[in-house]
Amino acid sequence: AIILKNKNYLFTDGRYTIQSKIESGKNFKILDYFKIINTNVFKNLNLGIDPSLFTSKQIKNFFLKNNKVTIIKENLVDKISKIKSKKKSSFYSIDKSIAGESHHKKVSRVSSFLKRNKYDYLFITAPENVAWLLNIRGYDNPTSPIPNSNLLLTKEKQVFLIVEKNKTTKLLSEKKLKQNQIIDPKYILDFFDKLKKGTIL
């Protein structure tokens, strides 16, 4: 979604167009998702972007052709949201018998893919994919156990979970992750600046 001073745009694919119109009413203009790429609908603006929600490639393709971008480290929607959930509750692991495969094997398979295709890093922005890779769940959404987080995986099988540290208590006690593998979203830009140069998928 793009929230402007006088207009709001919601981008979605054809499956959700009718539902989006019903739920958003007159508050948003509904557009097909593909129109967000270098769109002329909004231009000559300074757009605030949460860097934890987009890759640099997405920011370039979606917003930079006709606009300027300012990086905002705090999620403004979270600051004003009246929806209260168990956002401070720790993520938890699900058993291999439920997941079907250990997270170690999943990490190995994906890292091998990166090596074969000459990528150094995989940046995962979809929380459901983080949930699959690490076999974890959370309490962020009252209707879904998806753990709101991002993740960076290296071709050397290094895992960095990008999430508030208070959500990782159980994962740390299980020794699934170490302290240095937890990256607070507020410092994500500093984290990326310290990475070795390489290609990101």
Question: PLM features: what roles do these ranges have?
Answer:
Residues 2-201:
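A composition/biophysics-driven feature that prefers long, compositionally simple stretches
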